[in-house]
């Protein structure tokens, strides 16, 4: 497959509905259509990837950052630079809007993504979260734009 033929599109409600149908409601609920940026990737008619980031005010400071709420690439399309391209596109849009930094969370089960975050200049902070009282280990990642 030639990655230069992939189509990167701003997500809209129709795309969000499509994600819900094809990838599930849980994935679709992480797509933010306002106060941020959401981009989907198509190979022909096949949805192969998406990213969504939304704005958050930082405490104690009058600056805003974007939190990458979801970054997914279909298993068959991984290791082709799609996630990197999505992050670079969101970074560019964030810079255009004067956003201070990008942040994300990468859980232990997605450890394969850590080298990508590092290669893109993100700092890593090991941490645990406790959704529903159960520990989930991983990393917070952040990059000042």
Regions from the PLM with identified roles:
Residues 4-69, 74, 87:
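Acetyl-CoA-dependent GNAT
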Residues 36, 135-140:
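Short hydrophobic/aromatic beta-strand or adjacent loop that forms the aromatic wall/cage
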Residues 42-44, 142-145:
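Active-site beta-strand termini and strand-to-loop segments that position acidic
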Residues 58-59, 128-132:
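Short proline/glycine-enriched turn/loop segments at secondary-structure junctions
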Residues 73, 79-92, 115, 119:
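Conserved acetyl-CoA-binding loop-helix of GNAT-fold acetyltransferases
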Residues 84, 108-126, 134-135:
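Conserved active-site alpha-helix within GNAT-family acetyltransferase domains
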Residues 94-106:
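Conserved GNAT acetyl-CoA-binding A-motif
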